[in-house]
């Protein structure tokens, strides 16, 4: 995506998030955005909307179908997209909206890598640790099992890492011996 298109996508995304904050409907618009993005993932909707072969009328009909199950704010947003003939960028805009929601709500996904599966108690302790260390609210807790870390855990949140794995400790020990 070129810089001009990226700027356009970011502006539309930012505008929708600002409206959601102003109207105190972040949660509602966030779930609608996730639902629309899942439609894009499950179908070839992005290809359809960006196709030069498909007529504008067909694209408008399809977006109108999406509007039927949307809130007033999302309907208005989709209407602006149609009026400005930006439907080809709808998926990218919605992805931008999702990123902006994360920033606005400070809810980041937490990726935890362990050698064995975590218990519910351990998950709660990790959520508390992340809130304390990084000052963020948990979005989703994504658990990865990687036996090569041998023990401990690696937590990734918003490009920040806590690595208490035995593998890392052994690597540090090895470096200190040299």
From Swiss-Prot:
Q: Which InterPro entries match?
A: ATP_synth_OSCP/delta_N_sf, ATPase_OSCP/dsu
Subcellular localization(s) per the UniProt record: Cell membrane
Q: Which domain of life is it from?
A: Bacteria
Going by the UniProt record, its keywords in alphabetical order are: ATP synthesis, Cell membrane, CF(1), Hydrogen ion transport, Ion transport, Membrane, Transport
**What's a GO cellular component annotated to this UniProt protein?**
proton-transporting ATP synthase complex
Q: Name the major location.
A: membrane
Q: Does Cell cycle show up as a keyword for this record?
A: no
Q: Which SUPFAM superfamilies match?
A: N-terminal domain of the delta subunit of the F1F0-ATP synthase
Query: Which cysteines form disulfides?
Result: none
Q: How does it sit in the membrane?
A: Peripheral membrane protein
Single annotated GO MF = proton-transporting ATP synthase activity, rotational mechanism
The protein's matches in NCBIfam families, at most eight in alphabetical order, are given as: ATP_synt_delta, PRK05758.2-1
Protein family membership: Belongs to the ATPase delta chain family.
Q: Which PANTHER family match?
A: ATP SYNTHASE DELTA CHAIN
Which purpose does this protein serve, as stated in its record? F(1)F(0) ATP synthase produces ATP from ADP in the presence of a proton or sodium gradient. F-type ATPases consist of two structural domains, F(1) containing the extramembraneous catalytic core and F(0) containing the membrane proton channel, linked together by a central stalk and a peripheral stalk. During catalysis, ATP synthesis in the catalytic domain of F(1) is coupled via a rotary mechanism of the central stalk subunits to proton translocation.
Give the multimer and partner information.
Answer: F-type ATPases have 2 components, F(1) - the catalytic core - and F(0) - the membrane proton channel. F(1) has five subunits: alpha(3), beta(3), gamma(1), delta(1), epsilon(1). F(0) has three main subunits: a(1), b(2) and c(10-14). The alpha and beta chains form an alternating ring which encloses part of the gamma chain. F(1) is attached to F(0) by a central stalk formed by the gamma and epsilon chains, while a peripheral stalk is formed by the delta and b chains.
Please state what the protein is called: ATP synthase subunit delta
Q: What species does this protein belong to?
A: Streptococcus equinus (Streptococcus bovis)
Gene name tied to this protein: atpH
């Amino acid at each position: 995506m070129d810089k001009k298109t990226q700027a356009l996508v970011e502006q539309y995304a930012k505008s929708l998030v600002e409206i959601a904050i102003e109207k105190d409907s972040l949660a509602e618009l966030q779930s609608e955005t996730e639902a629309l993005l899942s439609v894009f993932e499950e179908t070839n909707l992005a290809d359809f909307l960006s196709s030069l072969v498909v007529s504008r009328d067909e694209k408008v009909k399809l977006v109108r179908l999406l509007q039927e199950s949307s809130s007033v704010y999302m309907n208005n947003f989709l209407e602006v997209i149609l009026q400005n003939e930006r439907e080809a960028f709808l998926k990218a805009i919605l992805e931008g909206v999702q990123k902006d929601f994360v920033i606005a709500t400070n809810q980041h996904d937490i990726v935890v890598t362990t050698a064995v599966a975590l218990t519910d108690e351990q998950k709660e302790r990790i959520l508390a640790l992340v809130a304390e260390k990084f000052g963020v609210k948990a979005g989703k807790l994504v658990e990865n099992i990687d036996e090569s870390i041998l023990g401990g855990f690696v937590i990734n949140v918003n490009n920040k890492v806590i690595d208490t794995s035995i593998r890392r400790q052994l690597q540090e020990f090895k470096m200190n011996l040299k």
